[in-house]
Amino acid sequence: MPRPSPCADSGGGMMTTLTARPEAITFDPQQSALIVVDMQNAYATPGGYLDLAGFDVSTTRPVIANIQTAVTAARAAGMLIIWFQNGWDEQYVEAGGPGSPNFHKSNALKTMRKQPQLQGKLLAKGSWDYQLVDELVPQPGDIVLPKPRYSGFFNTPLDSILRSRGIRHLVFTGIATNVCVESTLRDGFFLEYFGVVLEDATHQAGPEFVQKAALFNIETFFGWVSDVETFCDALSPTSFARIA
């Protein structure tokens, strides 16, 4: 059943143009999705996995607020909201054993091997670490998807969910820009999706230059980069043009 929108009626779809780098991009919000990547305590809260693994999460609060703003605007415009949660079962079977590169490269798994007292606490489904931050709450009509790897397209129904709804444009927010956000956007690019990142609604894992490098990669090779204020302006009723 189509999602309602205050910006369109039965006369046809509505298009808007988002100012972005390297150039503006035009899309129909009702055939687009806002994707919120891994806004879990693990990635955005002191005491979560990233913090315990030695990454700086002290500047994530503005990102949370900006995501709230973007979600509100997207929902009002009739965009599908998709929330990802990264993690595994309590026994970490889904994480893969020594035969998986994920076993060797996941900083969560490596941190637990170094600190056995954390075993079962990091990114385990049902744990505080796995939960979305308190400020971000999915609403009826949103879709919440678990994912076992960095990319939201790997071993998830994301592609079929999007294709069944005719969605081709994806707007990304979340953490970490240089890991799960970029991985999902890149995989989407290879599957013919148009990906946009809202830079002030994302946060990197690592130094500030990592954020800049990820955004450079995205705007140069794989997608587009904009910001929350510009995104919200593009979704205001005065910004829409009707398509036949």
Swiss-Prot record:
Pfam families: Isochorismatase (PF00857). The keyword Hydrolase applies. Disulfide bonds: none annotated. The keyword Hydrolase applies. The active site is at 38 (proton acceptor), 147, 180 (nucleophile). Its EC number is 3.5.1.110. Keywords: Hydrolase. InterPro entries: Isochorismatase-like_dom (IPR000868), Isochorismatase-like_hydrls (IPR050272), Isochorismatase-like_sf (IPR036380), RutB (IPR019916). GO terms for molecular function: hydrolase activity, acting on carbon-nitrogen (but not peptide) bonds, in linear amides. It is an enzyme of class 3 (hydrolase). Induction: Up-regulated by the nitrogen regulatory protein C (NtrC also called GlnG) and repressed by RutR. GO terms for biological process: nitrogen utilization; uracil catabolic process. Hydrolyzes ureidoacrylate to form aminoacrylate and carbamate. The carbamate hydrolyzes spontaneously, thereby releasing one of the nitrogen atoms of the pyrimidine ring as ammonia and one of its carbon atoms as CO2. PANTHER family: ISOCHORISMATASE-LIKE DOMAIN-CONTAINING PROTEIN (PTHR43540:SF6), PEROXYUREIDOACRYLATE/UREIDOACRYLATE AMIDOHYDROLASE-RELATED (PTHR43540). Belongs to the isochorismatase family. RutB subfamily. This is Ureidoacrylate amidohydrolase RutB. It comes from Escherichia coli O55:H7 (strain CB9615 / EPEC).
